[in-house]
Amino acid sequence: AANGTEMFKGKQVAGLQGLATLYPETVQIVTLKKSGIKSVADFKGKRIAVGAAGSGTEANARQIMEAYGIKYDDIKVQYLSFGEAASALKDGNVDAAFVTAGHPTAAIQDIATQNDVVLVPVDADKADALIKQYPFYTKLVIKAGTYPKQDADVSAVAVKCMLAVTDKMDENTAYAIAKALYGNLDRMKSAHSAANAISKATAKDGMSIKLNPGAEKFFNEK
C-alpha cells in the first residue's frame, strides 16, 4: 500500500506509518504425501492453488516461487480461496496450495484429519533472499505436532499482521495506543490464542514502513 505495488498498484496510500507489528500470518505451503512434492522446486508442471486473484496470499505465492526461479508459466495456476483450495486438495484437483494465516489453521487441520498432509518448507537461503527483497517477511518455524502426523519442524516465512496509521496521527495518540495495547496483553491472550505471539520485544519485526514517532518513543522506553 505504501509503495503502490501488488494489489495497490495505481492506488498508493500516502503517509502510511506503522504503529506495531503483532502476530505472524504464516505462509503455509500444503500438499499431500502422495503428490511426491518435497520442495517448491518440485512445483514445475504441477497444479498450484495460489490464493484468490489479487489477494495477499497470491502475492506471497508468487514472491516465494520467484525465489526458487519458478514463474506462473511454469505451473498450472489455480486461483482459489482458502476453503476452495482445501476442498480441491482433498478432492485431488490441485497438487499443492498456499495458505497465509495464523497457524494452526482450521482449513489445514480439516484436511489433515483424513489425509497425510505435508508442509513444504521454505529453505533458509531462499527465505534470506526473500527478506532482502521484501523486508516485510520474517522467518518462522512451524513446530512439529502443529498438525496431525506432523513429526518434524518445518521452516517457513510469515508476514506480520501490522497496525498502520497515517502521518496525521499525532505522537501522543500513537504513544497512548501502543501503551494501552501492550499494557493489556493478558486480557488479549485470554480472548484469543493469536495474542500469545504479540510482544513489545517483537513489535518492530517485519516493520517495512516508517514507525510513528509516538510508537517509537514507547518502544524505546525501558
Residues covered by each model-derived region:
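Short beta-strand->loop
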Residues: 16-22, 76, 109-155
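Short, glycine-/small- and polar/acidic-enriched structural segments
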Residues: 1-44, 49-52
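An extracytoplasmic/periplasmic, membrane-proximal ligand-sensing/linker region
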Residues: 80, 84, 90-91, 101-119, ...
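Extracytoplasmic
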Residues: 13-16, 24-26, 45, 72, ...
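Beta->alpha turn/N-cap motifs
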Residues: 1-6, 81-82, 98-105, 123-124
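A local structural motif
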Residues: 66-80, 93-96, 114
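A bilobed periplasmic-binding-protein/Venus flytrap-type ligand-binding module shared by bacterial periplasmic
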Residues: 26-37, 130, 134, 150, ...
